């Protein structure tokens, strides 16, 4: 009987866990839809401003750097903007982006400092004892553009002051509900796009291209950071929904297995009791 009580208690415990994971799955699904809409809505603007900036940076220059954010210099120190969730329970997403950043840091032959978004990233950078320039946590599930400006400002100030010579950004790109890819890209200096020979850029700049570039470049960095954070949030909620769905399915499967074990144990217990009764009756006869 004691064994039956233990099994029954475990079934009840797993059933309660299944209720929790099911609720978390539904919450994540709701947040995922909103995060996907925000992330996908910003993609066209992000892609177009990237195209314009890259085209401007590719224009012939008269020996003078058009903007400090375009300056290329010998790389003595690198910064990486590492974007992760604040919370776990989202499958392998956190491990994948941390592994991407960790591998990148190990491969560098120069000093690397990290600007970290998300508590999971902060914990990781501290665990590997890497220099951390700044940390930003608790941005929430729906940060707006203004919430991310301090992150962009740290990066741009350090680059323009010469504290760092190159900036990379690591985040999780949303592909679909089931697929989220860890991505690592160069953010600064801006890499000019290579156009095929003879291709017309098809842009007429008013005022002159240098003025447009000076105005757009800071916005480009800010938008790139903001868009990467939105992509990471959409990926996080998608991964969490899938993880909680798998946890719920596993819990249901475990409940079925435990119920089968419970029924077999109960049947065995009843059979033993009947045998004891029959044996006792036979002894009295």
UniProtKB/Swiss-Prot annotation:
Source superkingdom: Bacteria
Purpose of the protein: Produces ATP from ADP in the presence of a proton gradient across the membrane. The gamma chain is believed to be important in regulating ATPase activity and the flow of protons through the CF(0) complex.
Membrane topology summary: Peripheral membrane protein
Compartments in which it is found: Cell membrane
Native source species: Dehalococcoides mccartyi (strain ATCC BAA-2100 / JCM 16839 / KCTC 5957 / BAV1)
Alphabetized UniProt keyword annotations: ATP synthesis, Cell membrane, CF(1), Hydrogen ion transport, Ion transport, Membrane, Transport
Gene Ontology CC terms, in alphabetical order: plasma membrane; proton-transporting ATP synthase complex
Presence of keyword NADP: no
Gene Ontology molecular function, alphabetical: ATP binding; proton-transporting ATP synthase activity, rotational mechanism
Pfam families, sorted: ATP-synt (PF00231)
Subunit note: F-type ATPases have 2 components, CF(1) - the catalytic core - and CF(0) - the membrane proton channel. CF(1) has five subunits: alpha(3), beta(3), gamma(1), delta(1), epsilon(1). CF(0) has three main subunits: a, b and c.
Signal peptide stretch: none
Main location: membrane
Protein name: ATP synthase gamma chain
SUPFAM superfamilies linked: ATP synthase (F1-ATPase), gamma subunit
Similarity comment text for this entry: Belongs to the ATPase gamma chain family.
């Amino acid at each position: 009987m004691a064994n039956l009580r233990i099994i029954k208690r475990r079934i009840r415990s797993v059933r309660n866990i299944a209720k929790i994971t099911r609720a978390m799955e539904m919450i994540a699904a709701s947040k995922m839809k909103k995060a996907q809409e925000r992330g996908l809505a910003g993609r066209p603007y992000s892609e177009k401003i990237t195209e314009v900036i890259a085209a401007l940076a590719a224009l012939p220059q008269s020996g003078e750097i058009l903007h400090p954010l375009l300056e290329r210099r010998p790389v003595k120190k690198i910064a990486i903007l590492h974007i992760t969730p604040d919370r776990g329970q989202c499958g392998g997403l956190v491990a994948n982006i941390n592994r991407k950043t960790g591998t990148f840091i190990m491969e560098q032959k120069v000093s690397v400092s990290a600007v970290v978004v998300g508590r999971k990233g902060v914990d990781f950078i501290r665990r590997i004892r890497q220099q951390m320039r700044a940390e930003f946590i608790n941005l929430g599930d729906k940060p707006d553009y203004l919430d991310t400006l301090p992150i962009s400002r740290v990066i741009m100030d350090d680059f323009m002051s010469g504290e760092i010579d190159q900036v990379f950004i690591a985040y999780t790109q949303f592909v679909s509900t089931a697929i989220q890819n860890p991505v690592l890209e160069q953010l600064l200096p801006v890499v000019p796009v290579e156009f095929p020979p003879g291709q017309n850029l098809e842009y007429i700049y008013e005022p002159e291209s240098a003025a447009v570039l000076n105005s757009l470049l800071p916005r480009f960095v800010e938008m790139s950071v903001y868009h990467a954070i939105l992509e990471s949030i959409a990926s996080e909620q998608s991964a969490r929904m899938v993880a909680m769905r798998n946890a719920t399915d596993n819990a249901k499967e475990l409940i079925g297995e435990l119920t089968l074990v419970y029924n077999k144990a109960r049947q065995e217990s009843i059979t033993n009791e009947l045998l004891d009764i029959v044996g006792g009756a036979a002894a009295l006869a």
